[in-house]
Amino acid sequence: MPHIATMNTELKSRWNELVDAREEFFVELNKFSDNQFHSQPTDGWSAAQVVEHVLGAETGTLGYMKKKSSSGWDVLDKTSEENIERSKAVNARLASPEKYAAPSILNEPTNQYSKSQMILQWNLLRTDMEKFLNEIDETHYDKLVFRQPVAGMLNVLQTVEFMHHHLRHHIPQLRRIASNIS
């Protein structure tokens, strides 16, 4: 997927980090055969369930941002110091090696979709997300557009940064799964 040329530098940088994180995620994901992809360790998710979880989270995030901004960006609240601190805290939490339960707002992954199905769906989602982000006027980057279950409301810059940290958080999980099934 090409990097974006139309976003301002700050959002473009965060988007590119998210794109790069997905490439790193795919490096780990491609180490799984089709059978291994669905093999579920006794103590956790399969690689398929991790992908389904991340895809569900990103799908929900984009859907929330679209709905929240559908009445216009001017009516949205601006980012406060509290929003900044809470965003930093959730990203620090995701950067830690600790395991956390997925928020209850997300469905439990089913382990039934193929790798190719999910990658295709993820590619379509990322294209849609890129289009959405490109259409945001940079004067609205400080508007609160997404409610993250732990951090609360985030602006678009914080949301893309959160998705980046969320995706990176699951890369070691793929490595653990691979070591448990090999």
Describe the predicted segments one by one.
Residues 1-13, 60-120, 182:
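Short, helix-capping/interhelical loops that line the mouth of catalytic, cofactor-
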Residues 11, 18, 47, 118-122, ...:
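Hydrophobic packing residues in well-ordered alpha-helices of helical domains and bundles
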Residues 6-44:
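An N-terminal domain-cap segment
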Residues 37-90, 127, 134-182:
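Short, contiguous alpha-helical
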Residues 5, 27, 35, 111-112, ...:
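Alpha-helical interaction segments
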Residues 1, 26-35, 96-104, 139-146:
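Short alpha-helical hairpin
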